């Protein structure tokens, strides 16, 4: 299944939850009673929707998500938490969490177009897995830094307008940024409380239990 490129508001309305990585637009309040709506759903449908939250928030394909689930199963620790850590430590997501891009698709473009350095080398692979002690910076080019300046300013405005992006009000503790010199660093692996989307990762693991 390919990466979703359709209307983003349609997705957050369907899932009835904000997905700040997908779009900076706030969710429109629904008149449907969420509790009664949940009762009408099958267990499979509930697991499917939790899986879709991850897929659309991080902007990855079904095949990519399944691969991450398989990696998480082979790692030590809780499969669900390891899965979230793998997704959060992607380079495109880290650029987003640093406020250098308004959404993960926008962060992916910055990476794809060669604006981002990791340990002083250009990395143009959005799925690149960042590790603790790695340094991230923006290329010393006028265009690269102008794009990031614009995004940093817009990010501040977006936080004021959209309550769903309150978690973006400050850089998470596993990251550090110096906006004056366009440099950041990864201090540690992200912890569960700093995950950028509200999701029940155990239901996602259950969804893939017969596939991974």
From Swiss-Prot:
GO MF, one example: rRNA binding
Coiled-coil blocks: none
One matching Pfam family: S4
GO biological process per UniProt: ribosomal small subunit biogenesis; translation
Signal peptide: none
InterPro entries associated with the record: Ribosomal_uS4 (IPR022801), Ribosomal_uS4_bac-type (IPR005709), Ribosomal_uS4_CS (IPR018079), Ribosomal_uS4_N (IPR001912), S4_RNA-bd (IPR002942), S4_RNA-bd_sf (IPR036986)
CDD domains (UniProt xref): S4 (cd00165)
SUPFAM superfamilies: Alpha-L RNA-binding motif (SSF55174)
Annotated PROSITE patterns: RIBOSOMAL_S4, S4
Subcellular location field: Plastid, Chloroplast
Subunit structure: Part of the 30S ribosomal subunit. Contacts protein S5. The interaction surface between S4 and S5 is involved in control of translational fidelity.
Protein name (Swiss-Prot/TrEMBL): Small ribosomal subunit protein uS4c
Lineage: Eukaryota, Viridiplantae, Streptophyta, Zygnematophyceae, Zygnematophycidae
């Amino acid at each position: 299944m390919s990466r979703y490129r359709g209307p983003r508001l349609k997705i957050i309305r369907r899932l009835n939850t904000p997905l700040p990585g997908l779009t900076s637009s706030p969710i429109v309040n629904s008149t449907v009673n969420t509790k009664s709506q949940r009762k009408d759903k099958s267990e499979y449908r509930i697991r499917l929707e939790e899986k879709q939250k991850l897929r659309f928030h991080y902007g990855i394909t079904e095949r990519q998500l399944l691969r991450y689930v398989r990696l998480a199963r082979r790692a030590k620790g809780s499969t669900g938490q390891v899965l979230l850590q793998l997704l959060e430590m992607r380079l495109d997501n880290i650029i987003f969490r640093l406020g250098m891009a308004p959404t993960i698709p926008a962060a992916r473009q910055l990476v794809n177009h060669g604006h981002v350095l990791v340990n002083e080398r250009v990395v143009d692979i959005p799925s690149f897995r960042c590790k603790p002690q790695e340094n991230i910076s923006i290329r010393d080019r006028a265009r690269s830094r102008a794009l990031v300046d614009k995004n940093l300013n817009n990010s501040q405005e977006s936080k004021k307008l959209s309550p769903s992006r309150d978690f973006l009000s400050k850089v998470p503790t596993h990251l550090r940024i110096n906006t004056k010199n366009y440099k950041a660093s990864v201090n540690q692996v992200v912890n569960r409380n700093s995950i950028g989307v509200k999701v029940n990762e155990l239901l996602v693991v259950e969804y893939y239990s017969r596939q991974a």
